[in-house]
Design a protein with these regions (language model features):
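Active-site glycine/GP-rich loop and adjacent strand/helix microenvironment
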Residues: 2-176
């Protein structure tokens, strides 16, 4: 969503867009991004779009090194189900092929923009923030820890629309 991109871009000193208005690779922008003097660089995108971008035949012909750059991606895993790309394969392939410093995955919903749950490197679990929480429900009640159920997201951030409390279709569990 444009709102998600806007939110992440607020932290940027410079912004570069890898696609032009006709949805074609913008090689000039990509090269400018790589050559930028900023020390900390982040590539942001939605998971399925990131995968499509880095596997685009036109892009694969380029030998672009993202050494020292962090990739932040989230959402789009349901769209990736048909391609049978696992999270582990996604990370390993992009690190090996493009030399990313870090690859950070997050969980979030466009319906609750601003609430994102980053996956830790150590255990690959998603974590809440001080502004949000997750409740796991079975079909009737709040589920106990370590039992799978439907994910309900709670957030302090949305106040201009009723997005502070959303029951999703996703299945999850609280580990600790």
């Amino acid at each position: 969503s444009n709102v998600g991109m806007l939110g992440f871009s607020l932290m940027a000193l410079e912004k570069f867009y890898c696609y032009d208005k006709k949805n074609k690779l913008n090689e000039k922008e990509i090269k400018a991004f790589i050559k930028s003097k900023n020390k900390k660089k982040i590539v942001f995108g939605f998971t399925s779009k990131v995968w499509a971008f880095f596997n685009d035949s036109n892009f694969l012909k380029k030998q672009i090194n993202f050494n020292g750059i962090t990739l932040v991606h989230g959402g789009g895993w349901k769209k990736m189900k048909d391609s049978e790309v696992s999270k582990k394969y996604f990370d390993e392939t992009l690190k090996k092929k493009y030399n990313f410093l870090n690859i950070l995955n997050y969980y979030g919903l466009v319906e609750q923009t601003g609430s994102i749950f980053f996956q830790c490197k150590l255990h690959r679990h998603f974590h809440t923030t001080i502004f949000s929480d997750i409740i796991i429900r079975d079909k009737n009640f709040i589920s106990v820890n370590k039992k799978k159920g439907i994910v309900q997201l709670i957030s302090l951030l949305p106040f201009s629309y009723p997005g502070h409390n959303i029951l999703t279709q996703d299945v999850g569990e609280i580990i600790g």
